[in-house]
């Protein structure tokens, strides 16, 4: 009988489960995903999924947190000139969504939120409780940080839904630079109160 390999540690197991869940949510959506299916995809016992995450909602939140890392989003805002914070944040967000023909890891969460009220609520709570709070805390314009952060989220989520889920022709046809040129000044205004035109980049 072949000798079994060493069992993965808790950190590795959690990562395997999160990755399997992200793929499952992308493939079939939130409502059609079960903890048992995720466990099978990850090659672990369903009890381990419940032990690490408790419920499907908590697992979805963990996937969102792994994909939309607030620290990276904040780094995108904070690193470099304040006049380009909106552009950096948008480029980071678009990199997670990927191209229309080659979806990125975030697209599964967006599609799940469109088709499932449970997923939409979990994503809203994650944005409000994590990402938006951090953006508000580091906003250049502190007087409007709360509203500005919420408007940033509305712009980004709206863009994701319209371009990748609904697939409005004008948005799907636009390339990254065109989106940055058009949308980044809006995000910049939400963040700082000062819209900045985006320069053409080679």
Feature annotation, model-predicted:
Residues 93, 106-113, 152-156, 160:
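Short alpha-helical scaffolding segments that buttress acidic/His motifs in well-ordered protein cores
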Residues 47:
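Key DNA-contact positions within bacterial/archaeal DNA-binding proteins
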Residues 72-107:
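Hydrophobic alpha-helical connector segments
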